[in-house]
């Protein structure tokens, strides 16, 4: 009776999916969540179309053959380093976290070489948030007002049903909010 889920960033979408599956969960909180299946299939702000997805599938499936022949998986790369001067603010914030003592870890995908390049194949054909309207327990969705990924949280919230759901937009907050949530529970 005391099981809850907290999901930050990409794990926010995973947390909502898990909450839709597991009826033992009594409360879910997601902070600066991403819908990883949506962003993989459609790109940021849903700019990719069917042709772009097909091209990505061709590229990634060709990479699978290369990986097999080489006996190892090519990596997509973690947070860009060195940081380009014209990087978007959220990339600068990620760099300031994952590439410094604040958030660097030897096993962190974002600090190092990232995911396998082909891992997107399993995400792009799935709809992770398909069953979230069936979540019956309390859900809190937190996002920064100026976060580049805010639309993921707002769109997910629109799909939730019941009066025990809340969308909390933090005034003035940008993408770093999710990074600070990794560091402290004060923001949660």
Predicted segments with their positions:
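Short beta-strand/loop motif that positions the catalytic acidic residue
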Residues: 135, 141-143
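Conserved small/polar residues in nucleotide/adenosyl-binding loops
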Residues: 177-184
């Amino acid at each position: 009776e005391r099981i809850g889920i907290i999901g930050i960033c990409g794990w926010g979408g995973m947390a909502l999916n898990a909450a839709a599956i597991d009826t033992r969960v009594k409360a879910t909180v997601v902070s600066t969540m991403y819908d990883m299946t949506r962003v993989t299939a459609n790109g940021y702000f849903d700019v990719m179309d069917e042709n772009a997805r097909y091209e990505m599938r061709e590229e990634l499936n060709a990479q699978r053959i290369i990986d097999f022949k080489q006996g190892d998986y090519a990596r997509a790369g973690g947070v860009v380093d060195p940081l380009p001067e014209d990087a978007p603010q959220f990339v600068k914030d990620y760099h300031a976290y994952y590439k410094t003592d604040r958030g660097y870890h030897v096993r962190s995908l974002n600090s190092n070489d990232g995911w396998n390049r082909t891992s997107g194949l399993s995400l792009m054909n799935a709809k992770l948030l398909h069953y979230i309207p069936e979540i019956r327990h309390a859900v809190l969705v937190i996002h920064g007002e100026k976060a580049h990924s805010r639309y993921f949280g707002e769109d997910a919230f629109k799909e939730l049903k019941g009066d025990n759901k809340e969308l909390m937009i933090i005034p003035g907050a940008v993408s770093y909010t999710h990074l600070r949530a990794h560091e402290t529970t004060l923001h949660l």
